[in-house]
Amino acid sequence: MSSKLPKKSEENLELPTFPASEESLSRSEKLKYVFVRNPFIPLGCLMTVGTFLASGYYIRRENHLMANKFMRYRVMSQGFTLAALAFSVLFIGPPRREAPSNSSGSINSEIKK
């Protein structure tokens, strides 16, 4: 039974963390890739941080009505972020890769017959 399980070194080689085209990207290029791929997730994160900071501002000013209002906005922006994340996982999915070409052509010839 243990002979069927792959070794840990083989597991790491089979599951890359990024697609091969993204390995050479810098941090700013990866951030740009995320914004282009699904702009609503970073937007939701920025909205959450902004409303949280505004709520803290109003707490320091002792305006508790506005602080509570911005805490409600924070919860709504977190919900927006989670909805955007769920949408991207369910409908957009991972980037598609090209299928590897078969040099022998035997599979293609069998399908044509």
UniProtKB/Swiss-Prot annotation:
Domain HIG1 stretches: 12-103
Location of the protein in the cell: Mitochondrion membrane
Region listing for Disordered, in residue ranges: 1-27
Entry keywords, A to Z: Membrane, Mitochondrion, Transmembrane, Transmembrane helix
Gene Ontology biological-process annotations: mitochondrial cytochrome c oxidase assembly; mitochondrial respirasome assembly
TM region positions: 39-59, 75-95
Protein name per UniProt: HIG1 domain-containing protein C25B8.07c, mitochondrial
Originating species: Schizosaccharomyces pombe (strain 972 / ATCC 24843) (Fission yeast)
